[in-house]
Design a protein with these regions (language model features):
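Aromatic "clamp/platform" in nucleotide-sugar-dependent glycosyltransferases that forms part
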Residues: 271
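Short hydrophobic beta-strand element within catalytic cores of glycosyltransferases
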Residues: 279, 288-291
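Glycosyltransferase donor-sugar binding loop
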Residues: 46-50, 214-231
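Short alpha-helical donor nucleotide-sugar binding micro-motif in glycosyltransferases
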Residues: 258-263
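Conserved acidic donor-binding segment of nucleotide-sugar-dependent glycosyltransferases
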Residues: 306-313, 322-327
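Conserved donor-binding/catalytic core segment of Leloir-type glycosyltransferases
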Residues: 136, 176-195, 201-204, 218
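Donor nucleotide-sugar binding/catalytic pocket of nucleotide-sugar-dependent glycosyltransferases
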Residues: 129-172
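Nucleotide-activated donor-binding/catalytic signature segment of Leloir-type glycosyltransferases, i.e.
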Residues: 230-254
Length: 410
């Protein structure tokens, strides 16, 4: 590795929002610790931050005054972010970190605004192809998406899971309510369409009616901005006539730890994931995991747990019964999960991150990006025209030819 002197050398991070206790927020803070320990000046520039973390951040507009062609920006890409667009225009070298954008089709008829955001976000990501010195996925699945978009220089900065939020005293009220000899099937994650909560409900319904009436489904996670989807799930529960389905909403760390503690099996039917942190949280809490083998899930499972190939309620209900009723099988599954967790723990963020930084420092400089003052206005106009072509073709055909052919000036 190159020597790291680092006086006058800065590797800053820029992102839209720094959240408290979420996977990206933990990663950002971990990256900063590694960079500062290695001697780099490293600040976190954001548009907004959780009040508990505001003191650790700077306003993204201050980044302009800190900018220098020898600096490196670690840019955590997000949809339509002002901070991202400022970073694009600066002369600093750039390492883009891609945490995945859910395909917009999951939100059709559920969240129209998010359909638009995700559609434009995936297209906006393509504008960075020639701007990035290095584009990083936080999983191999995400790296392959970047490669498919045309990024020539890619790599993986793997998620290093932090379980400290689970090392708390569990909420005893949750334990009293649900640690009662019944079989608890747990899912943790946002109540959002790509998680396919409807599959979980159907799997559970068949398991409860065919194998085990003394069972319940615990769905732990926020439905914020997805009330319509949650209402559809409530209606599905009603139509199936199944009981003991519990939607908890957002929970505290103490409650989350308790839900993991009372769980007998962790069931995941997510169809689109860039990583899926709750899978490895369940490993950490030693709960057998059953998950649908889709997108990044098999790589995250890393040979552990149980993967199922088809979202067939009969097959999955039978799998649940096999795992719940066979203690020897449970122990074998847990050993595979323990081994996967050990492999994950052995991945040291510091050498991986610093070698990627060195790779950028040692690489040839990209041609400077000259950005017209109205570059992003032109980009947004072009995207609106492209959206019309896809969803309102009659209006698109009525546009003047010059508007239809509009492009971006740099």
């Amino acid at each position: 590795m190159n020597d790291r002197p680092r006086r006058g050398t800065s590797v800053h991070q820029v992102l839209a929002t720094l959240g408290y206790g979420d996977a990206i927020g933990n990663e950002v803070l971990g990256i900063q610790r590694v960079l500062r320990a290695a001697g780099y000046e490293s600040d976190i520039f954001v548009e907004t931050a959780d009040p508990r973390l505001e003191s650790l951040t700077r306003d993204f507009r201050e980044l302009v005054g800190e900018s220098h062609p020898d600096n490196i920006l670690i840019h955590h890409f997000s949809i339509g972010s002002k901070a991202s667009r400022v970073a694009y225009a600066l002369p600093d070298r750039m390492m883009l970190v891609y945490h995945n954008i859910t395909p917009p089709q999951y939100f059709v008829d559920i969240h129209k605004l998010l359909v638009r955001f995700c559609y434009h976000g995936r297209r906006e990501l393509g504008a960075y192809v020639d701007r990035c010195d290095l584009a990083l996925g936080d999983s191999e699945f995400n790296r392959l998406e970047l490669e498919g978009l045309g990024f020539a220089r890619t790599g993986v900065l793997p998620v290093v899971a932090d379980f400290s939020h689970l090392d708390v005293t569990p909420n005893d009220m949750v334990a009293r309510d649900f640690d009662d000899g019944w079989t608890n099937i747990l899912f943790v994650g946002r109540i959002i369409p790509n998680k396919r909560i409807e599959h979980l409900i159907r799997f559970y319904t068949l398991y409860k009616t065919r194998f085990n009436p003394r069972s319940r489904l615990l769905i732990v996670g926020s439905s914020q901005e997805f009330d319509r989807y949650q209402a559809m799930l409530f209606d599905l529960v009603r139509r199936l006539g199944v009981s003991d389905v519990h939607f908890t909403g957002h929970v505290s760390n103490e409650e989350l730890a308790a839900y993991y503690d009372v769980a007998d099996v962790f069931l995941c039917a997510s169809e689109h994931e860039g990583f899926c942190v709750p899978l490895v949280e369940a490993f950490y809490k030693r709960i057998p995991v059953l998950a649908w083998a889709k997108t990044a899930v098999p790589a995250t499972m890393d040979g552990a747990g149980v993967l199922y190939e088809h979202a067939d309620p009969g097959e999955v209900a039978t799998l649940i019964d096999l795992v719940v009723s066979d203690s020897d099988l449970q122990e074998r599954i847990l050993r595979t999960q323990d081994a996967a967790l050990e492999r994950m723990a052995a991945r040291d963020l510091a050498p991986t991150l610093l070698s990627l930084v060195d790779r950028v420092r040692a690489g040839p400089r990209l041609a400077p990006t000259a950005v017209a003052r109205d570059f992003w206005q032109q980009f947004d106009t072009t995207e609106r025209v492209a959206e019309l072509r896809l969803v309102r073709p009659a209006i698109y055909r009525a546009l003047p030819t010059a508007t239809r052919a509009s492009g971006i000036t740099v």
